[in-house]
Amino acid sequence: MLQVVLGAPQRLLKEGRQSRKLVLVVVFVALLLDNMLLTVVVPIVPTFLYATEFKDSNSSLHRGPSVSSQQALTSPAFSTIFSFFDNTTTTVEEHVPFRVTWTNGTIPPPVTEASSVPKNNCLQGIEFLEEENVRIGILFASKALMQLLVNPFVGPLTNRIGYHIPMFVGFMIMFLSTLMFAFSGTYALLFVARTLQGIGSSFSSVAGLGMLASVYTDNYERGRAMGIALGGLALGLLVGAPFGSVMYEFVGKSSPFLILAFLALLDGALQLCILWPSKVSPESAMGTSLLTLLKDPYILVAAGSICLANMGVAILEPTLPIWMMQTMCSPEWQLGLAFLPASVAYLIGTNLFGVLANKMGRWLCSLVGMVAVGISLLCVPLAHNIFGLIGPNAGLGFAIGMVDSSLMPIMGYLVDLRHTSVYGSVYAIADVAFCVGFAIGPSTGGVIVQVIGFPWLMVIIGTINIIYAPLCCFLQNPPAKEEKRAILSQECPTETQMYTFQKPTKAFPLGENSDDPSSGE
């Protein structure tokens, strides 16, 4: 009896390692934490840099004149005047010292300034905010740029050693990055933390999606699993920005990152129990080379759609909060909540079209999604307050959910159809496409905003998405591997023979046969 009780945890652990659902849970949690960390900094960084750099650099300018002006403001005659014009004394005294540096300190100027306090307060430091578009854009893009550089190495690495070790390496790097964000007080340290996040994200995303494609070999089941996993991504986007803005304003800068670090530890413990990351499990079949996959026009079309659709929200991350600070006088907590409709809609879109896209046609869902992305972006500059952003942002999130949940399974399907069924490299390409969008978007968006303004930036990226959308028609009926000779004449003979020869010998548990996972991890 005692032996049975003591052996129960080991038996449950063994069953867990054979469960496809628990593998899906591990990938879901990894994507959730990655994208929470991705978006939690969106409302924090602009206001944090504004508070630490702009206000500190201008404190000496305001400190001297404010002494003499404060003496004038505390006179009984002055307070009586402001009471006469229906302005509270407290509100006026907060803002007037900063304006007295440009006035004579007499009684009439405060009357004019009292009526324009909201406008002046909103536009204070406008030059600094415009310059911050570029710096913050580069900071946000650094994660995607590093991920872009690392992905080509992670894909082939997973083919050699399996998915488990890269997943755990990604967790450790993400944990270190989260701690750095919590205790970084300068732009340089934030940049290093963001770069580290890109490395960890590359390992987690490529290994996680490749693992799901290997476990769920049926096209319908794979689409559903990808939709659930992308739901973790969506939930991270959903929670990240509002969570970061609220915690930053009411608790402090470090608090959201410390909570994420604790959740990352739980994810690491889950990976240790389920994935057995000390075991090297290479693919028995040699995967198609990364260069060959990059020459496949159908994979390129799908990757381009992923890139451009996600570039829309990537451009909004650094530019929308600053635009709101300039035009809407938005407080800190609103900067994160502005992304809430997009995140909720993305969560709905990925889960809904993870199932529906297989029935409607994934190519059609991706086409409609890209058109909807373009239209939503065109509507963003029309908003005059945070409520006006609800519709465009919700449409944007839902449309990107359609695109991602449709095209991620297509990437695995194209490899099954036209190449060897080893998925590390193709999902490295998918992740590269995602990263290109998040690298080019923020880095160029800030520069474009400085030159032509935020509204025209939205027009440009929205129009590009609409123009690209018809290319998704080519994904309707891609030719199978037997037809590769007509598409890729140089690669066809070698790859077709390799696929035909290797398929019967494939023995990796997380591989092509749907019943194999029960004998694996």
Swiss-Prot record:
<feature type="topological domain" description="Lumenal, vesicle">
    <location>
        <begin position="317"/>
        <end position="332"/>
    </location>
</feature>
<feature type="transmembrane region" description="Helical">
    <location>
        <begin position="333"/>
        <end position="357"/>
    </location>
</feature>
<dbReference type="GO" id="GO:0043195">
    <property type="term" value="C:terminal bouton"/>
</dbReference>
<keyword id="KW-0472">Membrane</keyword>
<dbReference type="GO" id="GO:0051610">
    <property type="term" value="P:serotonin uptake"/>
</dbReference>
<feature type="transmembrane region" description="Helical">
    <location>
        <begin position="22"/>
        <end position="42"/>
    </location>
</feature>
<feature type="transmembrane region" description="Helical">
    <location>
        <begin position="395"/>
        <end position="415"/>
    </location>
</feature>
<dbReference type="InterPro" id="IPR011701">
    <property type="entry name" value="MFS"/>
</dbReference>
<feature type="glycosylation site" description="N-linked (GlcNAc...) asparagine">
    <location>
        <position position="58"/>
    </location>
</feature>
<feature type="topological domain" description="Cytoplasmic">
    <location>
        <begin position="416"/>
        <end position="419"/>
    </location>
</feature>
<feature type="transmembrane region" description="Helical">
    <location>
        <begin position="165"/>
        <end position="185"/>
    </location>
</feature>
<dbReference type="GO" id="GO:0045202">
    <property type="term" value="C:synapse"/>
</dbReference>
<dbReference type="GO" id="GO:0005335">
    <property type="term" value="F:serotonin:sodium:chloride symporter activity"/>
</dbReference>
<feature type="glycosylation site" description="N-linked (GlcNAc...) asparagine">
    <location>
        <position position="87"/>
    </location>
</feature>
<dbReference type="GO" id="GO:0042910">
    <property type="term" value="F:xenobiotic transmembrane transporter activity"/>
</dbReference>
<feature type="topological domain" description="Cytoplasmic">
    <location>
        <begin position="358"/>
        <end position="362"/>
    </location>
</feature>
<dbReference type="GO" id="GO:0015311">
    <property type="term" value="F:monoamine:proton antiporter activity"/>
</dbReference>
<dbReference type="GO" id="GO:0030672">
    <property type="term" value="C:synaptic vesicle membrane"/>
</dbReference>
<dbReference type="GO" id="GO:0051612">
    <property type="term" value="P:negative regulation of serotonin uptake"/>
</dbReference>
<feature type="transmembrane region" description="Helical">
    <location>
        <begin position="136"/>
        <end position="155"/>
    </location>
</feature>
<dbReference type="GO" id="GO:0015842">
    <property type="term" value="P:aminergic neurotransmitter loading into synaptic vesicle"/>
</dbReference>
<dbReference type="InterPro" id="IPR020846">
    <property type="entry name" value="MFS_dom"/>
</dbReference>
<comment type="similarity">
    <text>Belongs to the major facilitator superfamily. Vesicular transporter family.</text>
</comment>
<feature type="transmembrane region" description="Helical">
    <location>
        <begin position="297"/>
        <end position="316"/>
    </location>
</feature>
<dbReference type="GO" id="GO:0019899">
    <property type="term" value="F:enzyme binding"/>
</dbReference>
<feature type="topological domain" description="Lumenal, vesicle">
    <location>
        <begin position="43"/>
        <end position="135"/>
    </location>
</feature>
<feature type="topological domain" description="Cytoplasmic">
    <location>
        <begin position="216"/>
        <end position="224"/>
    </location>
</feature>
<feature type="transmembrane region" description="Helical">
    <location>
        <begin position="195"/>
        <end position="215"/>
    </location>
</feature>
<feature type="topological domain" description="Lumenal, vesicle">
    <location>
        <begin position="441"/>
        <end position="445"/>
    </location>
</feature>
<feature type="transmembrane region" description="Helical">
    <location>
        <begin position="254"/>
        <end position="276"/>
    </location>
</feature>
<keyword id="KW-0325">Glycoprotein</keyword>
<keyword id="KW-0532">Neurotransmitter transport</keyword>
<keyword id="KW-0770">Synapse</keyword>
<dbReference type="InterPro" id="IPR004734">
    <property type="entry name" value="Multidrug-R"/>
</dbReference>
<feature type="topological domain" description="Cytoplasmic">
    <location>
        <begin position="468"/>
        <end position="521"/>
    </location>
</feature>
<feature type="topological domain" description="Cytoplasmic">
    <location>
        <begin position="156"/>
        <end position="164"/>
    </location>
</feature>
<dbReference type="GO" id="GO:0071285">
    <property type="term" value="P:cellular response to lithium ion"/>
</dbReference>
<feature type="transmembrane region" description="Helical">
    <location>
        <begin position="420"/>
        <end position="440"/>
    </location>
</feature>
<keyword id="KW-0812">Transmembrane</keyword>
<dbReference type="InterPro" id="IPR050930">
    <property type="entry name" value="MFS_Vesicular_Transporter"/>
</dbReference>
<keyword id="KW-1133">Transmembrane helix</keyword>
<dbReference type="GO" id="GO:0033603">
    <property type="term" value="P:positive regulation of dopamine secretion"/>
</dbReference>
